[in-house]
Swiss-Prot record:
Keywords: Cytoplasm, Ribosome biogenesis. PANTHER family: RIBOSOME MATURATION FACTOR RIMP. It comes from Nitrosomonas europaea (strain ATCC 19718 / CIP 103999 / KCTC 2705 / NBRC 14298). It comes from the Bacteria. Required for maturation of 30S ribosomal subunits. This is Ribosome maturation factor RimP.
Length: 143
């Protein structure tokens, strides 16, 4: 079982979404990014998750020196199909594994997701991008 699979149901059970996990060399830093459907992540949210995960990681005998829990930030990564659905109409920066029309990097508006294919409006052109071809996708913050 992966660490993501271990933590996701616990975090979901507390009313949050596990966005991402970053690990440095084994046994060092474990960084967990959380979000929630309504509102912003607060310091109290991070403390509650951190306290709960500390106990879970101890029980599961997961070795780490430092645990950090935070929000994913304004430029939130988009990883799952549900992320793209949730942020339809928002602007995103997309990097592909395999080039599309000779290009791997795109900036555009998320239009829709059907059958694991994302439609992105990039400079007025509607691009069809298979989700499995995404290397990286992040929201572009509204300032």
């Amino acid at each position: 079982m992966s660490l993501f699979e271990l933590l996701e149901p616990t975090i979901a059970g507390m009313g949050y979404e596990l966005v991402d996990i970053e690990q440095s060399a084994p046994g060092r830093l474990l960084r967990v990014f959380i979000d929630k459907k309504e509102g912003s992540i607060t310091l109290d949210d991070c403390v509650a998750i951190s306290n709960h995960l500390s106990q879970l990681l101890a029980v599961e005998n997961i070795d780490y020196n430092r645990l950090e829990v935070s929000s994913p930030g304004l430029d939130r990564p988009l990883k799952k199909k549900a992320d793209f659905v949730r942020y339809m109409g928002e602007s995103a920066r997309i990097r592909l594994r395999i080039a599309l029309q000779g290009q791997r990097n795109f900036v555009g508006t998320l239009v829709e997701v059907n059958d694991d294919v994302l439609t992105l409006n990039a400079d007025g052109k509607l691009l069809q991008i298979e989700l499995r071809n995404l290397e990286k996708a992040r929201l572009i913050p509204k300032l």
